[in-house]
Amino acid sequence: MERIKELRDLMSQSRTREILTKTTVDHMAIIKKYTSGRQEKNPALRMKWMMAMKYPITADKRIMEMIPERNEQGQTLWSKTNDAGSDRVMVSPLAVTWWNRNGPTTSTIHYPKVYKTYFEKVERLKHGTFGPVHFRNQVKIRRRVDINPGHADLSAKEAQDVIMEVVFPNEVGARILTSESQLTITKEKKEELQDCKIAPLMVAYMLERELVRKTRFLPVAGGTSSVYIEVLHLTQGTCWEQMYTPGGEVRNDDVDQSLIIAARNIVRRATVSADPLASLLEMCHSTQIGGTRMVDILKQNPTEEQAVDICKAAMGLRISSSFSFGGFTFKRTSGSSVKREEEVLTGNLQTLKIRVHEGYEEFTMVGRRATAILRKATRRLIQLIVSGRDEQSIAEAIIVAMVFSQEDCMIKAVRGDLNFVNRANQRLNPMHQLLRHFQKGAEVLFQNWGIEPIDNVMGMIGILPDMTPSTEMSLRGVRVSKMGVDEYSSTERVVVSIDRFLRVRDQRGNVLLSPEEVSETQGTEKLTIIYSSSMMWEINGPESVLVNTYQWIIRNWEIVKIQWSQDPTMLYNKMEFEPFQSLVPRATRGQYSGFVRTLFQQMRDVLGTFDTAQIIKLLPFAAAPPEQSRMQFSSLTVNVRGSGMRILVRGNSPVFNYNKATKRLTVLGKDAGALTEDPDEGTAGVESAVLRGFLILGKENKRYGPALSINELSNLTKGEKANVLIGQGDVVLVMKRKRDSSILTDSQTATKRIRMAIN
């Protein structure tokens, strides 16, 4: 009763009655929604009714001096009434037209620079080609894709520092620009945007687009690089697709593509070396992709690919927690298991020791061309729902799932022995043995698996052992679906560990990745990849090995020279000479090495027979384990260009040609660099050229600072002392001579003193 009385009182007030009868929306929550806060709740509607008004725009009072009250047609451009609640003027949309036609003009030079990403997009679309539209069922799966073509790969924090430095250089706040890319971009943008009149906030927004990778989790069928994603709405619908070729490439896609190729090459090469992990790190640190250090790209680039993730794990970076098997990315979506070693017998009665996963688990499997949902129990496949582009892709997914299930009928389907090896000639682990076996031929596996009658379920059909579709029967537990399975959406990264054989494990010890998972697909990189590591010289064939070996000796001649006289064994064991050995005929390797080492020893013993060009030429041959024999050679053979070519022990040849006049070396006609000293002047021992004018005082003395390289010695003043690095990491203390007259005697004492200082 009380409430009704209260309501009557309220209704007697005319304002209450008006609100409740004339407001169509009388639900308090809705009124609240549309009236609270500054955020516009229905921008489209607001725009429509605003534009229906005569003066929908407000402007600063100064506009009255800058724009006439009426235009040429006599239409009013602004009203004398003030905007309610502010001291601004109400303005007609016609004023904007007048301003665009008659207002002041400013320089447009900065627009293409600030709105670079938009201008480039227009160019790509202008030069792109749109093909025919096809109507067909689209198997789209959600993938994490890059939606922002043409960006650098800075982290949000790095980009923020760059933007603050470029747009608001005088703002307070510590900004630390550390990475190479940050410094380069900042310098470039500051120059480009000098005297820029565009609103700083706008410039900041546009810079963010250029610097940071933006990703979204979108349904995609087809290309996933950013130049395809920017036209996703034009190229694929629910039941149609339109062919499209982009009218240009962008650096970020090229970086992703080239990074994958470099990582695959490096992992493949590291696998066959004595210490795969150390080799992999050495190669990652000495490789450049498109002029940027590979390690910098790895730190910033979120690409998830097996080889890339192995490189990241080696560098101690976090990677995705999903694991890889048979080229598919597996993500456990529910269940759990414990692992137990079990011995099983193949159809050929070979014993395999496999790690069995005990327990019920569900996984999503995502590959490039097929996806699946897998439910399994201990050594039993319960259900596999697979979808793919074609029969072949679906078959690949089924094989991987069947092997992963570890079912007995799969193991019994093995015919013949399992003895697959990796690139380093090591036996693969049992699961990969099985996988390789059935990837070669899966007929027996499919025949032995068993089939079952199926119910008619919308969007699902059966698949027979010969991989043909059926609506009545299907391989036991296997169904083909029209719908794809989404990629795992989380961007969560976990801490992992890596062993020296490049097996990557999570903190529970599960293997996430191993070199067996790295694709053998070869591609051509879009950006130039420079592998400075000697391990990658052979990637471009024997000629490249030859040229690179000699270039390396010349580049490091100052140090090589000292080692040659002080510690030849250490020099011969350098890994830079490893690739060269594959060019020397196996039968003569040891003999050549023994011959060259003896020759070098004679040069060391007899002053005055030191010949730089000859040492450089023969040095790589001395790296093989030597055979003691009295054999003498006038020429040494190397296998390049498909046949044996000769290097003359004394004198020039097409393989190795040293021009005394120009002091330049050509190897197989390619320039291999210049010798910095004349080969004839090294008569008085090797160090003479290096430490002439310096007195060797003894062992390293930390008081005189960090060790300088030989090239840095020239900066010392007379009488100044410094530690200097010679040979393989040996450091001695030297002093620059006060007088020039005594220089000649230095060369004789240098060798003795270095030996004493080191020993």
Swiss-Prot record:
Domain of life of the native organism: Viruses
GO MF terms, alphabetically ordered: RNA binding; RNA-directed RNA polymerase activity
Motif (Nuclear localization signal): 736-739
Primary localisation category: virion
GO biological-process terms attached to the record: 7-methylguanosine mRNA capping; cap snatching; DNA-templated transcription; symbiont-mediated suppression of host gene expression; symbiont-mediated suppression of host mRNA transcription via inhibition of RNA polymerase II activity; viral RNA genome replication
Protein name: Polymerase basic protein 2
GO terms under cellular component: host cell nucleus; virion component
A Pfam entry, by short name: Flu_PB2_6th
Key words of the record: Cap snatching, Eukaryotic host gene expression shutoff by virus, Eukaryotic host transcription shutoff by virus, Host gene expression shutoff by virus, Host nucleus, Host-virus interaction, Inhibition of host RNA polymerase II by virus, mRNA capping, mRNA processing, Viral transcription, Virion
Keyword Metal-binding: no
Primary role: Plays an essential role in transcription initiation and cap-stealing mechanism, in which cellular capped pre-mRNAs are used to generate primers for viral transcription. Recognizes and binds the 7-methylguanosine-containing cap of the target pre-RNA which is subsequently cleaved after 10-13 nucleotides by the viral protein PA. Plays a role in the initiation of the viral genome replication and modulates the activity of the ribonucleoprotein (RNP) complex.
Subcellular location: Virion; Host nucleus
